[in-house]
């Protein structure tokens, strides 16, 4: 049996696993990814990519590629406009009796696309079937070992690493893999999570469901109107219609509404269900794929078990309402990747990896509850549930961390009710446009491959200390002084953060503020050295 030694083994080649491979290679970490299916997915239950996830993809050099392959979201209020181009889609969620009477549809949710004050990029509508190949190709380009049609057969961990056996499903060839760490991104039914015996909490199963991918010309009914999702409030035939791409759609329904989970749902029956629910019984449909799945709400009680980490659906699963699932998985992967890199490159102790659970578990728990609340509210419109909803922009960009990897942060919740990005530790750095060598750059773009010390005009001693520490410790740490290496004519950074003239922010590789000082210090190098030691768990 062949044997491979690799720093990180990633199990699962969906969005989370492929993103992990990209981010690990971006941080200079070798990895092997195994995925039991032959290729990336042909169907999508994830299309909405929020602005925060786009920031991560932007920093990996993928923003333009994703935009080129996306439907372009426009303001939801424009959904009634006739004759819209097929590649434009209003970001709106509707509830309608049937599609034939779409003019009477009620707006259930209309997320704002106006994020220019929050992010250097914006949300996109890019199906999982398009995004997975983008991530796969980028991971391969960066040097990741990606193996589809390969399954994890077994694994066992010890104090120093993980021993696994993988099997090529085509040839039956078995390979022993020794890794320092394992990322389980193997989905809702994660075999790794089950083998570890990790328990979870949540509302449990919400029912067996079917997704029907089909092609149809709805122009005679819609007259160019477009929307992201419409909940069909047809008492005899309820379901959800989602735009897939320019000429294809996905219709989802709970099996219990049509005879139970054991009933046969072939393409012919599914086509009839779609026609009935949409109220247009004679329209031609080309059903291309029917996929059963189970909607559930479950969050793992622990995201870490020794040298194994749960990410994406393996860690948290919830209804698709809000498009939080794939976004959360990609953000899990990014949070974990820079921490693994810090440990594997000898810059941090293994204890830094405990902050993955400390940070991502509260976020995953609260996002799962938001998704469940949105799902229930969209179905019945209960006002009490509506009052519990947090704006999508806040959920996407406003989550914050309380952990030992941020100093001075103690938040009662991971997701605030109102957006607050003010440069405090535990928050993503507020987006401010600055000028660097004649080029406009966002503060969000500064910390890509390492830490960044961002000082105001009188904070040069902080920047000088950072430069010395980078040289002596090997920690990737770049220093910028506003007014010297960066210019800020509008003084926007001070307005956004309230940072003092002699103050500085320390940004982590994920763009979150790890520490701040509003004043100078007698020995800035000693202070900053101690700060980094605490963040990287070296003390």
UniProtKB/Swiss-Prot annotation:
TM region(s), chain numbering: none
CC cofactor: FAD
Pfam assignment, any one: Rng_hyd_C
Gene from which the chain derives: elmG
InterPro entries, sorted: FAD-bd, FAD/NAD-bd_sf, RIFMO-like
EC number of this enzyme: 1.14.13.200
Pathway(s) annotated for this protein in UniProt: Antibiotic biosynthesis
Protein name in the entry: Tetracenomycin B2 monooxygenase-dioxygenase
Family, similarity comment: Belongs to the PheA/TfdB FAD monooxygenase family.
Further remarks about this protein from its record: Since tetracenomycin B2, the most likely substrate for ElmG, was not available, tetracenomycin A2 was used as a substrate to test the enzyme activity of the purified ElmG.
Domain of life: Bacteria
Any GO BP annotation: antibiotic biosynthetic process
Example GO molecular function: FAD binding
Role according to the record: Involved in the biosynthesis of elloramycin, an antitumor polyketide. In vitro, catalyzes the triple hydroxylation of tetracenomycin A2 (TCM A2) to give tetracenomycin C (TCM C). Uses NADPH as an electron donor and requires molecular O(2).
Active site, per annotation: 231
